[in-house]
Amino acid sequence: MQSNLSQQKENTTTVKEKTVQIQVEQSSYDVVIIGAGAAGLSAALGLVKSEEYKALKSQGKQPKILVICKLQALRSHTGSAEGGIAASLGNIEKDCWQWHYYDTVHGGDWLSDQDAAKMLAKEARDTVIELEHFGVAFSRTEDGHINQRFFGGHTADFGQQPIRRAAYAADRIGHQILYSLWQKCIEENIKIEEDIYVTDLAINHKSNSVEGIIALNEKSGKVEKICARNVLIATGGAGRLF
């Protein structure tokens, strides 16, 4: 018994804790947008044309906007969309935003944010026209209008019959939208950083507010703290952050 105890004592090794210091690079922006798909790029462009942004510019100030993505920007999953973008243009048959609104809420099993669904349906027409101005090459009717086709869940008269509502660009609508938004962001000198993997939000627990993000720069291998007055999460559905 004693020999076993002494043997165990001899085999015991003391492990000392070692503190590893990680160098964290820090930068600061007015707005950081996480995600460079259609939502993130659209948000950046929306900020640029906002009255607040223009007012700051008129005062000689340059608001700093940063869009970050974990891959190359044009590899966003937005580019995989094929069917079309819903908008009550009425180019093929009579349509209205109220029908589009109903279909959106109904398609979401009545769980959707109905205020957001109403805004989406009402503004879809102007959004499609704006995308056309950005350079999206929509498929056309013989008389030159944006073409539309049937797509699942699009109905007339509040669910009574199918309707052609999806504006499309052959089978590459997502690709067209993504590239056009990206090009517009480049024209507006919006900064886009690639290969940045967000690991956490920087939270001030005293004020219970978000002050930026913590991220891993996969190119340099360094951890970065990016401070921001505003953080917008536009990461799509895959991460399930919704």
Regions found by a protein language model. Name each.
Residues 46, 77, 231:
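Hydrophobic/aromatic ligand-binding patch that stacks against planar heteroaromatic rings
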Residues 37, 225-242:
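Catalytic-site beta-strand/loop segments enriched in glycine and acidic/polar residues
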Residues 26-29, 220-230:
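Core beta-strand elements of the Rossmann-like FAD/NAD(P) dinucleotide-binding domain
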Residues 31-67:
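N-terminal Rossmann-like FAD-binding beta1-loop-alpha1 element of flavoenzymes
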Residues 24-26, 58, 191, 225:
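Generic structural signal for beta-strand residues in well-ordered domains
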Residues 3-12, 18-23, 63-64, 69-219, ...:
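Conserved N-terminal/central alpha/beta ligand/cofactor-binding core
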Residues 12-13, 55:
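Ala/Thr-enriched low-complexity intrinsically disordered regions
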Residues 33, 214, 231:
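Mobile, glycine-rich extracellular loop/lid and propeptide segments
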